[in-house]
UniProtKB/Swiss-Prot annotation:
GO terms for biological process: queuosine biosynthetic process. Its EC number is 6.3.4.20. Pathway: Purine metabolism; 7-cyano-7-deazaguanine biosynthesis. Binds 1 zinc ion per subunit. Its cofactor is Zn(2+). Keywords: ATP-binding, Ligase, Metal-binding, Nucleotide-binding, Queuosine biosynthesis, Zinc. This is 7-cyano-7-deazaguanine synthase.
Length: 234
């Protein structure tokens, strides 16, 4: 039973650089990957299409896309009408929690991942959070992940009855964006299939100025390879 649980993993998969690399890492570590994506009425819903394109190419055993009406809750520039911050220096990004923070997003996503993992008999969940090159979101920190893992093992029938123990994997949490990209390239990833921008235009082209675009540009520069992203012309 334990070996069967270790064989499967639920991977939170947005279609961006981090989650795509995370899925590739899970596969490289020998897991059968079940990719989980969300359309939460985010302004950059184009990332879901990127996820749909990438999941089969990455060898996901299954790709589940769930719709969540987080725009009904609001509280974020990603789901409402508030402007997405632009041109924030990298060194200032984590000084305060930005307007692109979505209330409790990773807790919501991880809870769905936990439910699916229990049904699948999968003891492992992968999430591509990063605590170095990031925008200061509280639910990307190591202490948050550790707390969720403790909660998960108190929350479901399979753990309470002793048939599995949930492990939340964060293989990218201490890597820079450049290191993440280098790791992905080692695993054969094509980053032109990914989407990062928080505020794309109607054609899906990246703005080039939001936190996510700036970190993406920084990552490719650090990795020493051309950025394949299609940006809006300034």
């Amino acid at each position: 039973m334990g070996q069967e649980h270790r064989r499967k993993a639920v991977v939170l998969f947005s279609g961006g650089i981090d989650s795509t690399t995370c899925l590739a890492v899970a596969k490289a570590e020998g897991f059968e990957a079940y990719a989980l994506s969300f359309f939460y009425h985010q302004r950059h819903g184009v990332e879901v299409e990127a996820a749909r394109r990438s999941a089969p190419a990455l060898g996901a055993r299954e790709h589940l896309v769930l719709e969540l009406p987080l725009d009904r809750i609001g509280g974020s520039a990603l789901t409402g009408h508030e402007e997405v911050p632009k041109d924030v220096p990298v060194e200032k990004m984590s000084d305060r929690i930005p307007a692109t923070y979505v209330p409790a997003r990773n807790t919501i996503f991880l809870s769905f991942a936990l439910a699916w993992a229990e049904v699948l008999g999968a003891a492992d969940i992968f999430i591509g959070v990063n605590a170095l090159d990031y925008s200061g979101y509280p639910d990307c920190r190591p202490e948050y992940i550790a707390a969720f893992e403790r909660m998960a093992n108190l929350a479901i029938r399979e753990t309470v009855e002793g048939r599995m123990r949930i492990k939340v994997h964060t293989p990218l949490i201490r890597l820079t964006k450049g290191e993440i990209i280098k790791r992905g390239l080692e695993l054969g990833l094509d980053y032109s299939l990914t989407h990062s921008c928080y505020d794309p235009d109607a054609r899906g082209l990246a703005c080039g100025h939001c936190d996510s675009c700036i970190l993406r540009k920084k990552g490719f520069m650090e990795a020493g390879i051309p950025d394949p992203t299609r940006y809006v012309r300034d």
